[in-house]
Amino acid sequence: MKLSDFIQALPKTETHLHVEGALPYELLQAWKPEEYPPNPAFRQPDYRYATFPDFDSILLSHALPWFTNAERYYEASKAIFAKHVAQNVRYVETSFHLAVTKFIRLPGPEIIAAIRAAVPAGLEVRIFTGMLRSDIVGDLRPTIDQLHTWDGLAGVDLHGFEAMRTEPETAAIWARLRAAGKITKCHAGEFGGADRVREAIEQLGVDRIQHGVRAIEDPAVVRLAAERGVTFDMCPISNLRLQVVPSLREHPIRRFMAAGVRCTVSTDDPLNFANTVNDEYHVLASELDFTRAELSQVARNGWAVADVPVAMKRAVSGEIDQLLNGSTPA
């Protein structure tokens, strides 16, 4: 079996995906072809974002004109999830930006319902909301205080510009949300150093770090993540394009896994990077020399943290075993 066929056949997950940042560019082109030309420079593989604000500006200038109502969330999500199904991705965790509820005056539960309505048969989707660190003390605080009541909300994520300080109240809010059955995540170790990863683990109590790349700068933080059973939901292509790493060969995912840190791979914001989940697996093989067994372990890691029944996890594990043994799963 060719490597490309093996990667396609792997039952995969995506656990780090921003729905606004996953807006399919072809939807924008079909909507306003005069404004969105084919193959813009920022979507080319050799394009590098100079700064996070540079990246954020491009994302917002493309996503905000589109996401103006629930129907647009449905339409985008339907196209996003179709791409997952085509790649044999069977479980997805995706987040919408909480501030959108204020920007377009659309209640969060309506966004959740729109995304949920777009989920096709055979795909498990868990919906999160993400917020800036500063939102904890801003106008969104009343909304944040009600998140535990939102049906269909799997969890929350702290994202955006990592240089912002983490507000002291965040730890208590995250703890309350966990007590209400919500999964808590935090972006850390992307543009901030290993200390931000330690902060997220020790102070916020999360066991899901989005990125985590720069934890490699402090072996003690790597050990902490391994000892606490923390998962790093990593995005190698995003890290390259945003210059978090100088090259894919220097990406630390292999070193993290060798140290006992569970790592997954996802696309982050494919609107900006023009990447797919399969692409992420291919670069692990081509740039970091991952074997098929190691690629399979990455897939297993995604299922280990997936919010699905144990029986489904066992079935998928058996399917991966069959692939590694050279037989075609039934």
From Swiss-Prot:
State a single Pfam family of this protein.
A_deaminase
Co-factor note (free text): Binds 1 zinc ion per subunit.
Q: Which UniProt keywords apply?
A: Hydrolase, Metal-binding, Nucleotide metabolism, Zinc
Question: What is the superkingdom listed in this entry's lineage?
Answer: Bacteria
Which residues constitute the catalytic centre? 190 (proton donor)
List residue numbers at the site (Important for catalytic activity).
211
Q: Name what cofactor the protein needs.
A: Zn(2+)
Known function: Putative nucleoside deaminase. May catalyze the hydrolytic deamination of adenosine or some similar substrate and play a role in purine metabolism.
**Protein name in UniProt:** Putative adenosine/adenine deaminase
Give the species: Opitutus terrae (strain DSM 11246 / JCM 15787 / PB90-1)
Q: What is the lineage of its organism?
A: Bacteria, Pseudomonadati, Verrucomicrobiota, Opitutia, Opitutales
